[in-house]
Amino acid sequence: MMVTAVKKAFLCVALSVCLAGAARAADFYQVRGGIPNSQYFLKANVVGNQYLFFIGDSVLNGAGLKDSNLRYSNQMVQALQKHFPDANMHETRHMQPGGSWFGLYRVSHGQAVFGEVIASGHLAILDFAADDRDVPIETVKTSLEGLVRQIVLYRATHSQILVYTLTPEMLAAYQAGKTPEYIRVSEQIAEHYGIPSLNLAQYAAEKIIAGQISFPAISADGINPTDAGAKIYGEAVAKFVDALVGANPTPDKPVKRTLPAPLFAETNDNGRIVAYEDVAVKRSGNWKPGQASPIGPFRHVLISNEAGATLTMKFKGSEIGLIDVVDKDSAEYQYAIDGAAFQKLAAPKAVAGPTMRPVSLAKGLDRKAEHELVLKVASPGVARVGGFLLNGVVEDPTAKLSTLERIDATYAAMDPIVYQPPAGRFVNIPHTMAKLRDGGELRMVLLGDSIMGNTSGSSFELLMMRDYPKCKIIKIASLRSSTGCKYYRLENRVQDYVLKYNPDLLVIGGISNGGDAEAVRSVVQQVRAGKPDTEVLLLTPVFGSPHDEHIRTYTREIDTTTSNFRFNLQKVAAEEKCAFFDMTGPWWAYIQNSGKTYGWFMGDAVHANARGCQIIGHLLEMWFKE
């Protein structure tokens, strides 16, 4: 009996020790509300490519690694892939300086200069520990919280994860038995918003403190991990992801989040980059918009080499700053807020080459009051402006315009397109043209990828209905990211993506057909087999990367001497009795003749912005117009 009691007591103690050890092993991460919405999207797998956005600093770049695949961001994607093997995940890393302060502006509503909403998709992983080392903790509080709130405001179904990597300051705190102040504040924010967090700093520090490895072995420079350090991070990532995915069942549909009140009263969640071409920015003097930037992520910059050239902007907000490109030839600026004395923003003296410079000009402003910034070139040299960093709002004179009025305003600010469509182009779409001319309802299905999303976003059907007022066009965008006819032709997908919409006219386009005109033919034939009276219009590619074939090997007219997608698609159109529009030719000719860099028309590295969409929209209007 005594032995049994002792055994029981021993087992209880052992179990307690094991549980305590498990608790200690797990306290380097917190699951909180988890990422159930991302689990839904990863499992549903209906959007094509799924981009996981890692936003942070040099650690994401893999600096210091011999094997770049060991970076923790890649290991996190691979760990998620094990749970969702069919999801086409892409690790998308955004490494820029400025820590969470600049992150507040980067993770905004989409900027014409930066070109993309870098927290799009459904999951943002935020890692600013290294760049926030020297930032006052009060700034971190409001910047990180504002950033977290903006992501939810942008997309209420978005999931987030906070990650903390090891720094010398954090290690010193852990060695002293303390929680680093940065992590304490970040965890306050994570707890307030129910965001999962992964404390790689603690996981690595515990191994150093236990004597299992030295800090130099983990990181040669104190910030960026070595291969050995990255493997330790990878251990933690694997445990975290397993716990994260296992904590919540995958929901039947994503749930929109409602933001609580800010944790810190000073937090402002209106961070944005006001691009220099915004109507709120007034120019005087000699400025050249739409010029090529010597560095990314700018798509284009505003350039002046005239001392005295001035930019003025009225705004409401708590902080205003500047983002520009500086180099050895840069001019200095002077700036004034609300009529105060001008202050100097010096030209940099120690840059090795073109460098992005985000800088605050004034903070702590009355966010409800109207302010005015005046910025002027104040010395010989070159000014290369991207935009203004504003935690606040500017007046949008287009906000009350209708969609048609807005696209008219966009196009009015562009050089007009000169294009003469070919005769005989309507021969294979007689019923479509009859409905346009004579009236009735025209059901038009757009099939393709996100470039066809740009096509839909141009609202070209409104331009067409203005030309053909008797006809009501029902436009249906049936799209999947990075997806073309090589996908749609399989497994009877034409039923779900085309036939169920009962189209009168099917429009196939985009840049994701993989150069395979025969895949397009297969889709056309399957659609006609299911609904023989469907008319079809085939479009050649527009937009995309400069490395894509239709740009890299561009000719104004289709090259009929070699096998290329434009030529092959033209042959498919003729043989399958489809209408055909070689949009590539006039689209790229317009951009080449515009006097602007390609980025002037880009919304990101691949897609069109509002100007680019109106090239598409007005070309389609011209093609359909008799």
Each predicted region: which residue ranges?
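Active-site segments of SGNH/GDSL-like serine hydrolases
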Residues: D127-D131, V148-R184, G510-I511, R528-R566
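Charged helix-capping and loop-helix junction motifs
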Residues: T139-G146, T179-I183, A517-V523, F565
